[in-house]
A protein has these predicted regions:
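Substrate/ligand-engaging "lid" and interaction regions
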Residues: 1-170
């Protein structure tokens, strides 16, 4: 079955200067409400080599701290963070890493309060096999012909799936 996911407007590459700038523009947008992470179980790690001025920080929690700090400085409301990494207490572990960067980078107490009170870091359990994009160019071409457009984000996943989200009452 074909399902169009129209809530994804684009992909940004933060490792390119323009992509990093666009990521920070999104961070300061009123439209941003939810961030979903799926960086694999190795992605939620604190790397003391990350710096606030890195473009971008090398770790995912470092990048997230940069995004949240930019959002905070722009005066925008907190976000809902949905961590999907396959580790215990993924949301709490991600928040712990962000707080470590707040300490390491000497960011102000107002930002710490923003992260810990205005943002919500939810834990989650995800069970769905998503093998990834279709690698056969012929199959991709057939799908593009059938549906009438090219989709650079074309992906496949098993029919069964469950997403359990743990959070507070916010």
């Amino acid at each position: 079955d074909k399902r169009v996911i129209s809530s994804v407007s684009r992909c940004l590459n933060p490792y390119e200067e323009e992509g990093f700038k666009q990521m920070m523009d999104v961070a300061a947008s009123d439209d941003l409400e939810i961030i979903v992470s799926n960086t694999t179980e190795a992605g939620i790690v604190y790397d003391p080599a990350c710096k606030l001025e890195d473009v971008p920080a090398s770790s995912f929690p470092g990048k997230l701290t940069q995004v949240l700090y930019h959002r905070y400085k722009a005066g925008k409301k907190g976000i809902l963070m949905l961590a999907c990494e396959l580790i215990d207490n993924n949301g709490k572990e991600l928040l712990k890493c962000v707080n470590q960067y707040i300490d390491q980078w000497g960011l102000d107490d107002g930002f710490r309060k923003y992260v810990n009170e205005d943002c919500t870091f939810c834990g989650s359990l995800v069970d769905r096999i998503v093998p990834g994009r279709i690698r056969d160019p012929k199959e991709v071409a057939e799908l593009e012909q059938k549906h009438g457009y090219a989709d650079p984000l074309l992906d496949v996943g098993e029919v069964f799936g469950v997403w359990v989200i743990e959070g507070d009452t916010k």
